[in-house]
């Protein structure tokens, strides 16, 4: 497993962004783990998370000159990622949207650099149904930008339903043709748990969950 994947999973565990147990998901499934990026809630944690994002994005050789953060969770992620790239001496443009239209001041729904003519990376924490990402794609294209990649923290690699064996990530890539990179996947989480003696008791429930709900192809 790549070092940045291990760093991310350990950071998530230490930050309580990654928890093990029994969790009822919005889908009604009982999951043996839960991921909540809201627990990266300090400057140090967010900076460390941004390093992991940048490492994953660089490993995927994504081509972009602007980072777009969908409201709301994508906003601090995009800002932190742009700061991390500045630290690496690459100055990227930054834009995010607001969900409510502002009718005074600068107005509109976009804050930051103009999107027109830009190659744009969208960043978010996870892709569940893909609604926020699809809205971001619509906003970007309407503003004259070109979405060239999507980055998320964790890819759950989970089928949509028993009759639809694609994950939300696979469905989004098939629909849009835009590559999605994740810092880590459920497969990485399984390997991480297997290699950590203190987490050994969670391996079998995770494996059973992946066997039942996991996608057949890697994504």
Curated annotation (Swiss-Prot):
GO CC, one annotated term: cytoplasm
Binding residues annotated for 5-phospho-alpha-D-ribose 1-diphosphate, in chain numbering: 26, 72-73, 98-99, 102, 104, 124-132
Keywords: Glycosyltransferase, Magnesium, Pyrimidine biosynthesis, Transferase
Ligand binding (orotate): 34-35, 128, 156
EC number: 2.4.2.10
Entries under SUPFAM superfamilies matching the protein: PRTase-like
GO molecular function, one term: magnesium ion binding
Enzyme class: transferase
Pathway membership, UniProt: Pyrimidine metabolism; UMP biosynthesis via de novo pathway; UMP from orotate: step 1/2
Disulfide bonds: none
Domain of life (superkingdom): Bacteria
Catalytic reactions on record: orotidine 5'-phosphate + diphosphate = orotate + 5-phospho-alpha-D-ribose 1-diphosphate
InterPro entries xref list: OPRT, Or_phspho_trans_dom, PRibTrfase_dom, PRTase-like
Cofactor(s) for this UniProt protein: Mg(2+)
GO biological process, one term: pyrimidine ribonucleoside biosynthetic process
Family recorded in the similarity comment: Belongs to the purine/pyrimidine phosphoribosyltransferase family. PyrE subfamily.
Task performed by this protein: Catalyzes the transfer of a ribosyl phosphate group from 5-phosphoribose 1-diphosphate to orotate, leading to the formation of orotidine monophosphate (OMP).
Quaternary context: Homodimer.
Protein name: Orotate phosphoribosyltransferase
């Amino acid at each position: 497993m790549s070092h940045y994947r291990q760093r991310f999973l350990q950071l998530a565990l230490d930050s309580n962004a990654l928890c093990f147990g029994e969790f009822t998901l919005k889908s009604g499934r009982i999951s043996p783990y839960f991921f909540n990026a809201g627990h990266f809630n300090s400057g140090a944690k967010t900076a460390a998370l941004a390093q992991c994002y940048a490492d994953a994005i660089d490993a995927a050789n994504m081509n972009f000159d602007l980072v777009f953060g969908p409201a709301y969770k994508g906003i601090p992620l995009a800002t932190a990622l742009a700061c991390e790239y500045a630290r690496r001496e690459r100055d990227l443009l930054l834009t995010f949207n607001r969900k409510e239209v502002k009718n005074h001041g600068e107005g509109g729904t976009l804050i930051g650099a103009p999107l027109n003519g830009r190659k744009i990376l969208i960043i978010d924490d996870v892709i569940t149904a893909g609604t926020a990402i699809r809205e971001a794609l619509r906003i970007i294209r309407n503003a004259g930008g070109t979405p060239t990649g999507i980055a998320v923290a964790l890819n759950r690699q989970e089928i949509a339903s028993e009759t639809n064996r694609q994950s939300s990530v696979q469905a989004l890539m098939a629909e849009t043709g835009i590559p999605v990179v994740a810092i880590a996947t459920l497969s990485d989480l399984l390997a991480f748990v297997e290699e950590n003696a203190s987490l050994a008791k969670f391996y079998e429930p995770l494996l059973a969950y992946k066997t039942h709900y996991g996608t057949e192809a890697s994504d």
